[in-house]
UniProtKB/Swiss-Prot annotation:
GO terms for cellular component: cytoplasm; nucleus. Alpha N-methyltransferase that methylates the N-terminus of target proteins containing the N-terminal motif [Ala/Pro/Ser]-Pro-Lys when the initiator Met is cleaved. Specifically catalyzes monomethylation of exposed alpha-amino group of Ala or Ser residue in the [Ala/Ser]-Pro-Lys motif and Pro in the Pro-Pro-Lys motif. Predominantly functions as a mono-methyltransferase but is also able to di-/tri-methylate the GPKRIA peptide and di-methylate the PPKRIA peptide (in vitro). May activate NTMT1 by priming its substrates for trimethylation. Keywords: Methyltransferase, Nucleus, S-adenosyl-L-methionine, Transferase. It is found in: Nucleus. This is N-terminal Xaa-Pro-Lys N-methyltransferase 2. The gene is ntmt2. It comes from Danio rerio. One of its GO terms (biological process) is N-terminal protein amino acid methylation.
Amino acid sequence: MEFSGTHQAFRNRWAKTDDEMCKHSMSFHLHKTLRKEFFASYLYLLEQIPLVKLYALTCEYIKGEKQFYYRAQNFYKDVPPSEEGMMGDFVEISDIDLEGSRQFLKKFVGPGKAGTKCALDCGCGIGRVSKGVLFPVFESMEMLDMMEEFILHAHECYLGDYADRVESYYLYNLQEFIPPRKKYDVIWMQWVACHLTDKDLMEFLMRAKESLRPNGVIIIKDNMARQGCKLDPIDSSIIRHLDIMNGIIQRAGLNILDVEKQEGFPEAIVPVWMIAMR
């Protein structure tokens, strides 16, 4: 197909730039500048030729998954373990975000719905969502994050008395985590699906499906692109259009129960959507 040759040309040119020019250059600034300009060119190509698949962007174009995930982990090393760190420049919308999550969760938990025994918070950070949304509903929690500093701060400081109700902390990258079978009433994934490639997100959702208790649900809350997809090469986050996300969910064998946009955020912020599935 037409776009295949173009995509291969981009890959070949970047490999030469990265392996020959940048490897021998003493200028880290030059290296970063070249990367930024090259990513910008590739994203322009994606917009012009929508048949280019996001999987190629995240898994092939960035010279393999290890580099893609290393960049995200390296980015979060500089993020402070605080609400400000978790919310970036938008800590003022934290309460709005939590209230929207609480109202969405109510639709799926209670008599005749998902139980309240145990929930898993994926990409939990310091536990902002666990503390503000999940602990008030569930008897116990399990929390997962790739950053040890965040988990330690959650347990030792941020969660307070709630920490006594945490069954397990998992220091894992989500793409490598195998959740226990039939364990959770709710699996909450907020601002973490954006850090997985299409393939790894689909495969994690397949594993997560097997870890749900009867009537259990998986909830993804994440930034959604207004059109196509966008990659931030600094922190390796992918903003997908809602249709792209829905396609990944369906390929994982899950049924979408409800989709709702988070209201009350400033117009300048990328739209945030909540998706419930089982």
